[in-house]
UniProtKB/Swiss-Prot annotation:
PROSITE patterns assigned to the protein according to its UniProt record, in alphabetical order: G_TRME (PS51709)
Organism placement in taxonomy: Bacteria, Pseudomonadati, Pseudomonadota, Gammaproteobacteria, Pseudomonadales
Protein name as catalogued: tRNA modification GTPase MnmE
Entry-linked InterPro entries: G_TrmE (IPR031168), GTP-bd (IPR006073), GTP-bd_TrmE_N (IPR018948), GTPase_MnmE (IPR004520), MnmE_dom2 (IPR027368), MnmE_helical (IPR025867), P-loop_NTPase (IPR027417), Small_GTP-bd (IPR005225)
SUPFAM superfamilies tied to this protein: P-loop containing nucleoside triphosphate hydrolases, TrmE connector domain
TrmE-type G domain boundaries: 216-379
Amino acid sequence: MNTVRETIAAIATAQGRGGVGIVRLSGPLASQAGQAITGRTLTPRHAHYGPFRDADGLVLDEGIALFFPGPNSFTGEDVLELQGHGGPVVMDMLLQRCLQLGCRLARPGEFSERAFLNDKLDLAQAEAIADLIEASSTQAARNALRSLQGAFSKRVHGLTEALIALRIYVEAAIDFPEEEIDFLADGHVLRMLDDVRSELSTVQREAGQGALLRDGMTVVIAGRPNAGKSSLLNQLAGREAAIVTDIAGTTRDVLREHIHIDGMPLHVVDTAGLRDTDDHVEKIGVERALKAIGEADRVLLVVDSTAPEASDPFALWPEFLDQRPDVAKVTLIRNKADLSGEHVGMEQSDDGHVTITLSAREDDMGLDLLRDHLKACMGYEQTAESSFSARRRHLEALRQASAHLEHGRAQLTLAGAGELLAEDLRQAQQALGEITGAFSSDDLLGRIFSSFCIGK
């Protein structure tokens, strides 16, 4: 049920100059505003070309007006779109005209929020709009579109329906003890529960892949000066993103580059060489490098394989281990194999540490090994056509639902406690409901929609 009565307006197209710009309105004043601006009564879902006029009848622009009466519109309310020339001054004049007619400026994401509140789409679909706009690769855009079309929501709804059926069976047995249903002897509850757990595990895995394509991972390149860190960044980026010289300390600040490997986004950070220095600026760069190391998903510790001290790379900089105690997330890169004559390849020690020997000067000397290794570190798989976009909050909700099902199963098998199982099933259903918005606090909704673009 729609309780929003204000009419909102915003420029729906990106800032800057363009061939076409769109001002969008939603609310009860949309039809009246369209008539005032165009001077005619707009036929629903028809394109009307003509002048857009101000309050004095002067022409502001010429373009197309489209009116979509609710509830058959994106927001579920009356919607007006004014498509004119995409100059910022023209768009601003047209927007100001709408505000003069009683509209107010829309908040970021408010159009999508109204669509959600009016049951035109659920929360996961609304978030997919933002993900589609922000997609940084073809596969990420395809996944976001599938989520917008309801692929993710359908999977969640399927899990929810299965949980509801299971809850009905369990709670009926609790409420009618005279039926004397033995949960364990019956076996029906455990079979249903395990089926839900299996499907939930599949959705978790697919959602994890979707989140990878959306968020990617942060990879920090660290090491001594002149180890070849910037050359490695340039090879991964496929361009001269960093300055490369023989002068130690050329890189004095963190340099960030956004790249893709088979569609997976990587945020690669090149850092200042790790060494003791009296240079104030370089010292700041080293401090920032250590900070980046501590925040990374994966660290590539680059060593010059021709240097005498390369035999014990972790001893080169003791503070490195202080910043990154989980050495399992550090990959040792023995660089300059073209000079040292070392065999190009990848080795994994008994304790799980990975060493890759390569040359950052030559793309065919170990770079493909590194790319495959980075994909494997994040558990990346070539995305199937059925995949969808997901966010970290979705993964957390799925994790919580899984934890409740695991706990409920343990309560049933160890103690035969049907009442405790029923409560865990309820909480699992609520966790899934947070994904689609069936159970979401106002604070959560506010945070989600405030991250959208204005006009969306």
